[in-house]
């Protein structure tokens, strides 16, 4: 089961994409929705609104605990901001909001991302952040004009762009592969009985 934080933003498009890839999807709005998840997507949207929703619903510490448990987490655009030092503090990064400019400055780029086979990833940037500061355990996967826009630290992958808008499924496929591997390692007996 993969969760999609559904407080605001493009959560429906992420859920649809994950379902099309064969995943069972749960919209996450309150802490109990995090129970039993094998992966989580924190989608783009408006980071201040998402922050207020997380605070209102008491989700901050449960989200931190989920990430600390090793569950794969994938954040896009505002999701990158939500996971940085200043917000949930899950990643050792500092982000700059709207780093590429306002919506009128939206753009697309092709990015080579390690671990993603095939042609470059088509990245759609809309009021996108970039990473200003990375801790030493953070791996930079892609950059635009020298600014990191895709980074990973352990089980958490964040990107500054919107794969769901471009119809780019490979990053979601990566999350599902990681979730499947985690499920296999953490619940081998349960999986063995299902066969």
Give residue ranges: language-model regions.
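Redox-cofactor binding/interface segments in oxidoreductases and associated redox assembly factors
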Residues: 42, 75, 159
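Hydrophobic anchor at the start of a short beta-strand
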Residues: 25-26, 73, 156
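Glycine-rich nucleotide phosphate-binding loop and flanking beta-alpha elements
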Residues: 11, 47-49, 80-82, 132, ...
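Short loop/helix-cap segments at secondary-structure boundaries that form the rim of catalytic
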Residues: 15-18, 33-36, 83, 133-136, ...
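Amide-donor transfer/coupling interface in amidating biosynthetic enzymes
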Residues: 98-195
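Cofactor-binding loop segments of dinucleotide-utilizing enzymes, especially the Rossmann-like FAD-
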Residues: 7, 78, 161
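N-terminal beta1-alpha1 cap of cysteine-dependent amidohydrolase-like domains
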Residues: 1-56, 65, 169-173, 177-195
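Cysteine-nucleophile active-site neighborhood
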Residues: 46-112
